[in-house]
Structures are given as C-alpha cells and as structure tokens.
Regions:
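Bacterial N-terminal signal peptides that target proteins for export
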Residues: 5, 11-24
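Bacterial N-terminal signal peptides
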Residues: 22-34
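Bacterial Sec signal peptide processing site at the extreme N-terminus
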Residues: 34-56
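Soluble non-cytosolic domains of exported or imported proteins
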Residues: 52, 65-79, 137-141, 184-193, ...
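Acidic/histidine-rich, surface-exposed loop or edge segments in extracytoplasmic proteins
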Residues: 52-66, 124-132
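Sec-exported extracytoplasmic/periplasmic mature domains
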Residues: 63-67, 79-90, 199-203, 220-232, ...
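Acidic/His-rich structured neighborhood in mature extracellular/periplasmic domains
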Residues: 80-247
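Pan-zinc metallopeptidase signature
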Residues: 251-360
Length: 360
C-alpha cells in the first residue's frame, strides 16, 4: 500500500509503517467493539489510511503546474488561517499542512437514524469518542447499504455527504479538495471549515455531539468573520454573512417543524393519524425550503446538532470577556458535566462553567 515516490528517502517507508500502525490502533480502539461489526472497522481503517497515503505537502501542491489556479489560491491561505486560529486559543496542530485531491464530491457519507414516531435517535458507542448519533462511511455504496439496513428496522434514516471531518488530533488531517468549494463563498467556506474542525482538535467532550458541534459552529462563525474583516476581504465577509442569514432561517424553520412534530408524537392520537399528520408537516417543510427529498425525524435531529446553542455560548463569551477566559471556562466542561450522553440542552452547563472560570 505504501509506494515510495521518486526522490524520497527511505525514512518515508518507516514513517509509513508508523502511521499505518497508528491508524490500526486508533480504528481498532474506536470501532472494534461497535455493533456495526468488522466491515465498519475495515472501511474506516482503509479510508483513513488512504487519505494519509495520498497526502502531499501544501507547498508542493501549490508549486505543481497542474494544480488549478483556484485551488492554488485557496491553499495559499491555509497557513494564515491556522495561525489566526491559534491567536484566539485554538490548539496548534500539524493538521492542514498537506493536501489531498479526491475523486469524489464528499470525503465521507454520514448515516443517522431515529424512531419514526419519536425523536429518539440511534446511537453507537465507541471507547474514544463515546456515543455518537451518526456513522461515517468512506464509500457511498457502503453508506447506502447501511442506510437500507436501518430502514429495514423501521427507522427514519438520513444519509448526507460531509466535506471534512476531524480525527481530534490523532492524525495530521489534510486539506481535502472537498473543502475547497466553488463560487463567491469559496474562501469564506475554507476559513470556516478549517477553524470549525480545528475547534474539535482543541476541545472535544466524549458522548456530547450537540455540544461539540455547537461549540465548533459558534467559534468558527465568530472567528471566520473576524479573519475576513481583518484581512480586508469584505466581499467574502458579505458572502458568508448572507449565507448565514439564510442558514439561520432554514434552521429556525426546521426547529419549528421539530417542535410541532414532537407535540404530535407526545399526543394521544392514533398511530395512523400521527403518521398522516407527520407526512403533511414534512411535505410542507420540503416545499417551503426547496429540499430535494422529504426530510424525516433523523433529518431534524441532525439539524439540531449544529449551532442550536449559540445563545448560550454567546452569553458565556460576554461574561468571560476574552477568548483566553472563554477557553478556560470551556475546558472546565467534561463528560461528567452533563446528565447523560448526547444532551440536547446545556445552558446550565455553560453557566456553571462561567461561574467557575469567569468570576468578576
């Protein structure tokens, strides 16, 4: 699997063996006890190892005459983005110093599931990351097969692509071609995703996906705007702000549907009436938001995972006053701070962190 490139020294092969061993140990520890079996372990290890094998230094990609100008320009910003993040408390890592050009539109495809008449999401538990409400697959066909297995159990299933993910500092994550979008929001999108994934490598609480994603969303939103503003990239700043207005509108509408459906599920009407009313509510949501497919309970649960607690983080930041004190407060939070796995609300946790770390 490890093929030495022309002109590279023999230490590359030794380093390859070391990285391969780390991949195996990480994936084995994280996934081997999972209920999805050895096939999930195999694809996870192979997928991660493939990325590490294909990664090349960003400087080399920039110098390569075959690298498109658009990609070259975006890659040249990565070092500056990383340095900017560390100024505001993100942990310096060796991630995003290499580049991988993928031959697919997404790096992984993510599956999640929920009961059809209750917002009760399926969870998978692993030693390193705790419980998680979704699984990622490097091969789209594998993801589809797993989604069909979940559907056969009578569950609502969501299958979506992801342009990036973080190994939480276990590996040096590369910049992926899937992280380099087209259009006027290309640079702002790259700034956002590098900062977002860097937050995960800075703070990660096992078993608390909504907390982790909401924290990353809050921090990356603030810092991405500050980065663009401080670098005089006003057109990109306007683009990202416009995009977030629309994103917030869609998220609010998703939340409204969640609240309406949750009340329906908890009511005493018959199962048949619940299913009929659910179909009506979701059909309206699809039409209003212009979705390509009808959403379901798993879709709405995933929507709640990202950015659903921004007000709590904003209140904590205002109380702490500086990024240094904000991160000090965040680092007082661990798995024991929550009442159980996958808490959907944690304003009390954030308030307690402020009490401990940001006293007047």
């Amino acid at each position: 699997m490890w093929k030495r490139r022309r002109g590279e020294g023999s230490d590359r092969g030794a380093r390859g063996v070391s990285i391969a061993a780390r991949v195996f140990l990480f994936v084995a520890a994280a996934f081997v006890v999972g209920c999805t079996g050895p096939m999930y372990l195999l694809q996870a290890g192979e997928g991660q190892l493939d990325l590490l094998c294909r990664a090349r230094p960003i400087e080399r990609a920039i110098r390569d005459p075959e690298t498109p100008d658009r990609v070259r320009k975006l890659l040249s910003e990565v070092k500056s983005i990383k340095a900017f993040g560390t100024k505001f408390g993100l942990t310096p890592t060796s991630s995003y110093e290499t580049y991988v050009a993928l031959d697919r539109p997404r790096v992984v495809w993510v599956t999640s599931a929920s009961d059809p008449l209750a917002f009760k999401g399926r969870k998978w538990r692993f030693p390193i990351v705790g419980s998680v409400p979704y699984l990622g697959w490097f091969d789209r066909d594998d993801a589809r097969r797993f989604a069909e297995e979940l559907k056969a159990e009578g569950l609502d299933v969501e299958l979506r692509g992801a342009s990036a993910y973080s190994t939480l500092g276990w590996f040096s994550d590369p910049v992926l071609s899937t992280m380099l979008p087209d259009g006027p929001q290309a640079l702002s999108g790259l700034v956002d995703v590098v900062l977002h994934e860097s937050v995960h490598a800075t703070v990660y609480v096992a078993g608390q996906s909504t907390f982790n994603e909401s924290l990353a969303e809050y921090v990356s939103n603030r810092l991405a705007e500050e980065y663009l503003r401080s670098h005089g990239l006003l057109a990109e700043l306007a683009a990202i702000q416009t995009g977030r207005v629309e994103s917030d509108r869609r998220r609010r509408r998703m939340h409204e549907a969640y609240v309406e459906l949750n009340a329906l599920y908890e009511s005493s009407v018959t199962k048949e009436k619940k299913l009929a009313e659910k179909a009506r509510i979701l059909a309206e949501l699809k039409k209003e938001l212009g979705l390509s497919r009808t959403p379901n309970n798993a879709t709405l649960l995933q929507s709640k995972t990202y950015g659903s607690q921004d007000q709590g983080f904003e209140a904590l930041f205002e109380r702490c006053g500086t990024w240094e004190r904000f991160w000090k407060a965040i680092r007082t939070i661990d798995a024991g701070s929550f009442g159980g796995d996958q808490a959907s609300k944690f304003s009390g946790v954030l308030a307690a962190a402020g009490d401990e770390a940001c006293k007047p």
